[in-house]
A protein has these predicted regions:
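Amphipathic alpha-helical coiled-coil scaffold segments and their short linker/junction regions
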Residues: 69, 77-86, 146, 209, ...
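Short, charged, amphipathic alpha-helical segments
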Residues: 94, 145-148, 211-219, 411-419
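Alpha-helical heptad-repeat coiled-coil segments that mediate oligomerization/polymerization in large
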Residues: 210, 364, 371, 407-411
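A small-residue-enriched
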Residues: 32-50, 81-136, 239-248, 275-341, ...
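Periplasmic alpha-helical coiled-coil/stalk elements that build and connect Gram-negative outer-membrane
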Residues: 14, 32, 140, 160-277, ...
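Short segments within alpha-helical structural elements
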Residues: 223-251, 356, 360, 394-448
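Terminal intrinsically disordered/low-complexity segments used for targeting and assembly
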Residues: 2-85, 232-277, 443-451
Length: 451
């Protein structure tokens, strides 16, 4: 019985087909993907859920968010919306998300196969080899998991950066409002002290008081004028600071901060339920938790990097039976180097990530409690000025004006009471600004607006 020999071309095709199938499988596995990585839309949604702001700007959109009009004044909500939309520093921070997504793409890519071709020269026959490191294919799932978790951690940190920016803008807006009100009161106080100095000067010329007695009102008037000029500079500086946080260019109209209903000073009682809510809401805590998972995935990857396995496809043009092709492997025998250093480093990173997570939780609890204490103290101080001190001085002023109209007291006494009332209102403005700042710090510590 005789068997006919298959043509050389048929044997070559049968040998090449498995190699092509393997190559296609590898190509499919190596497709770049960012599945599971957060996008700008995800960050935008998380920010909106915590701040009810206008969201993140896309580069092709105008420099101001929709429904924001600087012509009628700048409210706190508008300032926050503009900052998230337009702040150069925050826009630069958002680029970290693109870097993390690119790292995920790179983690999913596989190494290119190495093709070696030996040309026939003299007695040398034509040969070629195709080599591929299959160990990288085995390590790919752990590598991709680590990169995906890292991208998620970056997304959470970006949300926390946004909340920090919101707190900075709200504080700057509150400071600008307080600076405007201080300047208004300083102008009123300067006018009163000038009138007192004028009365003292008239009494000095009439011989009713001595030169020594007249110097005190004059010095007080000079002092209030200096304070008035300083507060004008403070007002301008507060507005410039706010504009810088908003990322407005030099051609933009000057900001005119406006007090609005968004300045919520209602009490926010912090109990165990609030602490749990803060731990669940804080993006930095969630980022630290995800960092543990990412470090664990990297540890699995490092433990897989022990055995180097290279698949080989060898072919020559003039074997015993003509064209020949066959598989082979090259194995890195782990006698000495089993990636002990990489595995130990990965384990240390897992421990460090765990410690940082515990530190983040401890920090959040302490921050929320201290912010709540400051908010309570600021609220008590504000109540004292609003309910007791300022109303008492207002009553005293009305009584002094009635007595002056009845001819029972001098104008000097009326002006002195008015000046003390202006001073009290100045301190009331400071107390209100402290209350706003304390509430803003509490909102930031909670990871969302405390309602």
């Amino acid at each position: 019985m005789s068997c006919s020999r298959a043509p050389v071309g048929s044997r070559a095709k049968r040998s090449i087909l498995p190699a092509l199938a393997a190559a296609l499988a590898l190509a499919g596995a190596a497709c770049a993907s960012t599945q599971g990585a957060p996008t700008r839309a995800d960050v935008d949604t998380a920010i909106r859920a915590r701040t009810a702001s206008a969201g993140i700007r896309v580069d092709s959109e105008p420099p101001l968010p929709p429904d924001v009009n600087l012509g009628d004044g700048l409210t706190q909500d508008e300032a926050v919306a503009i900052a998230l939309w337009n702040s150069p520093n925050f826009q630069a921070t958002l680029a970290d998300l693109g870097v993390a997504r690119a790292d995920l793409v790179e983690a999913g890519l596989l190494r290119n196969p190495v093709f070696s071709l030996l040309f026939p020269w003299g007695p040398k026959q034509l040969e070629f080899t195709l080599q591929y490191p299959f160990d990288l294919l085995i390590q790919r799932p752990a590598r991709v998991d680590a990169a995906r978790l890292n991208a998620r951690a970056v997304g959470e940190r970006l949300v926390w950066d946004a909340l920090s920016l919101v707190a900075q803008v709200r504080t700057a807006h509150a400071d600008a409002i307080a600076a405007d009100r201080r300047l208004t009161l300083a102008e009123e106080n300067a006018s009163l002290t000038r009138r007192l100095a004028g009365i003292a000067d008239a009494r000095l010329r009439a011989g009713d008081i001595s030169d020594l007695e007249a110097r005190a009102p004059q010095s007080d008037a000079a002092r209030t004028d200096v304070v008035h000029r300083a507060l004008r500079h403070d007002r301008d500086l507060a507005r410039l600071t706010l504009a810088a946080l908003l990322g407005l260019d030099e051609n933009a109209a000057p900001v005119q901060p406006q007090l609005s209903a968004s300045y919520d000073t209602a009490p926010c009682v912090v109990d165990d339920a609030r602490l749990k809510e803060a731990l669940a809401s804080r993006p930095d805590v969630r980022a630290a938790e995800i960092a543990i998972e990412a470090a664990t995935a990297r540890a699995h990857w490092e433990r897989d990097r022990v055995l180097a396995l290279v698949g080989i496809l060898d072919a020559n043009g003039k074997g015993d039976k003509g064209f020949e092709m066959g598989p082979g492997v090259a194995v890195d025998i782990p006698l000495f180097n089993r990636n002990q250093g990489g595995a130990a480093r990965a384990d240390a990173e897992v421990e460090r990530a765990s410690r940082l997570y515990l530190a983040a939780r401890t920090h959040v609890i302490a921050e929320v409690r201290s912010a709540a204490a400051r908010a309570a103290q600021a609220g008590q101080a504000m109540d004292a000025w609003t309910r007791d001190i300022v109303p008492s001085l207002e009553t005293e002023q009305r009584q002094a004006e009635s007595a002056y109209n009845a001819g029972e007291t001098a104008l000097l006494n009326v002006l002195d009471v008015s000046r003390r009332l202006v001073d009290a209102r100045m301190q009331q403005v400071d107390a209100e600004a402290d209350q706003f700042r304390a509430r803003i710090a509490l909102d930031r510590a909670m990871g969302r607006y405390c309602r």
